[in-house]
């Protein structure tokens, strides 16, 4: 709890209320500092849905970042006399909607990962307790300063079936992204040509297509790729993923990210993730969450397998050529090639998704992911023995 003096905004003392007094179900903060962090947490603990001002307003900062990165590129083109001032201005104006789409996509994914983390929190309470200690040691996270609960307080909440709230998850998510970016800038693979797609995805598609070579030479190339990779990992697999992989495998942070990129691509995770997102407001959010957690489970398992079996020897392109085509072939074998009891399990999961309104093709693909985690082992054994699958 806190009093008016601790809030430090005397002009609004007569207007201020407590978070638990709000009767609305959802809060979105259009401005900064409308809530204190403790008020957000109190509101969330009372059943409300809220994030933080820096999450709700992240689009503003993101838009500025895109603008700066684009202007650096265009100024470089101007100096080389590849672009006139007039064309530069018109080009900037023409990209307004494209930049908006990029910004909103980032904002959407960030809120999505916080929601998914909240969805799974009952089963990951101890994991997040460890994560906060990990970030405290490596990323400068101070629990008291950020109003985050101690291990003991988390245990007390769990007894009451209360867990880390979305405002608290928002803080942890931000610290993990900042930490990852710092680590990845110095990763030995950050300049690998395979990762250029992450660099180009930071720019409007029309600009990336027109100035592909010039973007590849962007002065902030490493920073941009590191930022994109940090966003990919945290947004897709959650803020606790890196900590969990490091603790369970002993691998370095940069190696975990490398393996995660490989796993995402060889299993074509992004393709199915986008199809799930396309079902917004067409199926229940819980149904989408179930499908997304099935994909992230596959991604976690395959990342762990790559870390334990490849020992960082394999490159991005090699992983793609070694596994991707074979995994597609194995995927098509399911459920026919599964043992009878697994076939029954497959049908049950598949029919459950269809009953919840998921299109049959997507329901089948997502259900196949439940049984694909051994695919990399099958392929490895096949290639070692020189036998076809």
Language-model segments: what does each one mean?
Residues 2-389:
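Ligand/cofactor-recognition surfaces for anionic moieties
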């Amino acid at each position: 709890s806190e009093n008016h003096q601790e809030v430090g905004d005397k002009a609004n003392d007569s207007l201020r209320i407590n978070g638990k007094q709000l009767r609305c179900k959802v809060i979105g903060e259009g401005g900064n500092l409308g809530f204190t962090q403790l008020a957000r947490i109190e509101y969330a603990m009372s059943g409300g849905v809220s994030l933080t001002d820096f999450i709700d307003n992240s689009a503003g900062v993101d838009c500025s970042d895109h603008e700066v990165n684009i202007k650096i590129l265009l100024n470089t083109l101007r100096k080389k006399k590849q672009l006139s001032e007039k064309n530069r201005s018109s080009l900037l104006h023409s990209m307004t909607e494209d930049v908006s789409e990029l910004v909103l996509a980032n904002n959407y994914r960030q809120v999505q990962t916080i929601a998914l983390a909240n969805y799974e929190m009952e089963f990951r309470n101890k994991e997040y307790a460890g994560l906060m200690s990990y970030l405290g040691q490596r990323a400068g996270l101070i629990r008291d300063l950020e109003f985050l609960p101690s291990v003991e307080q988390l245990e007390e909440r769990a007894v009451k079936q209360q867990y880390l709230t979305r405002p608290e998850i928002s803080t942890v998510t931000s610290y993990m992204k900042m930490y990852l970016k710092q680590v990845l800038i110095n990763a030995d693979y950050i300049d690998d040509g395979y990762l250029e797609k992450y660099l180009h995805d930071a720019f409007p598609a029309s600009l990336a297509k027109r100035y592909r070579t010039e973007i590849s030479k962007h002065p902030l190339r490493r920073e941009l790729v590191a930022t994109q990779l940090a966003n990919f990992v945290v947004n897709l697999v959650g803020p606790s993923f890196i900590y969990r992989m490091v603790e369970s495998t002993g691998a370095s942070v940069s190696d975990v990210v490398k393996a995660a990129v490989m796993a995402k691509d060889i299993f074509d995770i992004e393709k199915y993730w986008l199809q799930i997102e396309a079902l917004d407001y067409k199926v229940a959010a819980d149904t989408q969450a179930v499908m997304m957690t099935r994909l992230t489970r596959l991604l976690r398992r395959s990342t762990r397998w790559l870390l334990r079996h490849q020992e960082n020897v394999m490159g991005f392109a090699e992983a793609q050529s070694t596994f991707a085509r074979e995994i597609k072939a194995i995927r098509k074998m399911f459920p026919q090639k599964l043992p009878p009891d697994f076939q029954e399990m497959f049908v049950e999961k598949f029919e459950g998704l269809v009953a919840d309104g998921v299109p049959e093709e997507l329901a089948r693909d997502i259900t196949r992911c439940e049984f694909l985690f051994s695919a990399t082992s099958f392929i490895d054994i096949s290639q070692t023995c020189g036998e076809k699958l």
